């Protein structure tokens, strides 16, 4: 006659901690196994762990000024606080980063403004 799993669980449930400890030792001796916790290997290299985490800092890159360069220059000045010449140089030198190390909301806001002005933008 085979013993059902439920019967075994009921028997274990009624045991004291000392009796459970003795049962574990008996299993270790009988089957040649160890009840020690298995060490789980960590991720290989730090790059894999960093890639799994959500990115918190973004860079808004002006890929291309588009047809309406004047509007893009105004948007760049508004976002960065640069002077006219500096903003024009940035737009003329595209692709260039407009904002670096900003959070996701600020990056999306900057991208939206620049795209509305006619620029092609990437968020990295």
From Swiss-Prot:
Q: This chain belongs to which protein, by name?
A: Large ribosomal subunit protein bL12
Q: Does the keyword Repeat apply?
A: no
Q: What does the protein in this record do? A: Forms part of the ribosomal stalk which helps the ribosome interact with GTP-bound translation factors. Is thus essential for accurate translation.
Q: Report the family membership.
A: Belongs to the bacterial ribosomal protein bL12 family.
Keyword NAD listed: no
Its lineage opens with: Bacteria, Pseudomonadati, Pseudomonadota, Betaproteobacteria, Burkholderiales
Taxonomically, the superkingdom here is Bacteria
Under NCBIfam families, the record lists: L12 (TIGR00855)
Q: Which organism is it from?
A: Burkholderia cenocepacia (strain HI2424)
HAMAP family, A to Z: Ribosomal_bL12
Q: Which GO terms describe its biological process?
A: translation
This protein's UniProt keywords: Ribonucleoprotein, Ribosomal protein
Assembly notes: Homodimer. Part of the ribosomal stalk of the 50S ribosomal subunit. Forms a multimeric L10(L12)X complex, where L10 forms an elongated spine to which 2 to 4 L12 dimers bind in a sequential fashion. Binds GTP-bound translation factors.
Q: Name one GO cellular component term.
A: cytosolic large ribosomal subunit
PANTHER family to which the protein is assigned, alphabetical = 39S RIBOSOMAL PROTEIN L12, LARGE RIBOSOMAL SUBUNIT PROTEIN BL12M
Which GO molecular function entries does the Swiss-Prot or TrEMBL record give? mRNA binding; structural constituent of ribosome
């Amino acid at each position: 006659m085979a013993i059902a799993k439920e019967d075994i669980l009921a028997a274990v449930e009624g045991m004291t901690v000392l009796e459970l400890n003795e049962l574990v030792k008996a299993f270790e001796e009988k089957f040649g196994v160890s009840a020690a916790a298995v060490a789980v290997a960590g991720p290989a290299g730090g790059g894999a762990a960093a890639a799994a985490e959500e990115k918190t800092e973004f860079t808004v890159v002006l890929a291309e000024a588009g047809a309406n360069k004047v509007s893009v220059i105004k948007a760049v000045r508004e976002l960065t606080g640069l002077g006219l010449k500096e903003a024009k140089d940035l737009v003329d030198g595209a692709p260039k980063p407009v904002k670096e190390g900003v959070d996701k909301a600020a990056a999306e806001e900057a991208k939206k403004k620049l795209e509305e002005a006619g620029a092609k933008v990437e968020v990295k």
